[in-house]
């Protein structure tokens, strides 16, 4: 790991060169991209499913479709203001910029 004041390391420069040579790329992100915005991930130490294992049930389509209590609990959480004050972070903005420049072929999250 290099100190940020030293500039990008060799691995970062090599990755940037590969992306530039590709023209456009597919990007795969997970919930972790949003943690800097204050949105918890799922399996991390403060993750949604780590702190509330029952919440994982809402992610299973078979359970979600057949259990009205799971659906109700999920909608209560979603409507409870958990998104208030949340703003895109530098990672989100970088992906938007990358897309606007034509470098993003596909984004899967």
Question: What is each of the regions a protein language model found here?
Answer:
Residues 1-109:
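Conserved catalytic core of sirtuin-type NAD+-dependent deacylases
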């Amino acid at each position: 790991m290099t100190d940020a004041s030293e500039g990008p390391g060799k691995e970062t420069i090599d990755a940037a060169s590969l992306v530039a040579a590709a023209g456009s790329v597919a990007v795969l992100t997970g919930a972790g991209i949003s943690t800097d915005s204050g949105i918890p991930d799922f399996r991390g130490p403060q993750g949604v499913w780590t702190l509330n294992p029952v919440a994982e049930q809402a992610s299973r389509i078979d359970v979600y479709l057949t259990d009205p209590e799971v659906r109700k609990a999920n909608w209560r959480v979603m409507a409870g203001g958990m998104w208030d004050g949340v703003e895109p972070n530098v990672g989100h903005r970088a992906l938007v910029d990358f897309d606007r420049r034509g470098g993003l072929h596909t984004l899967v999250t």
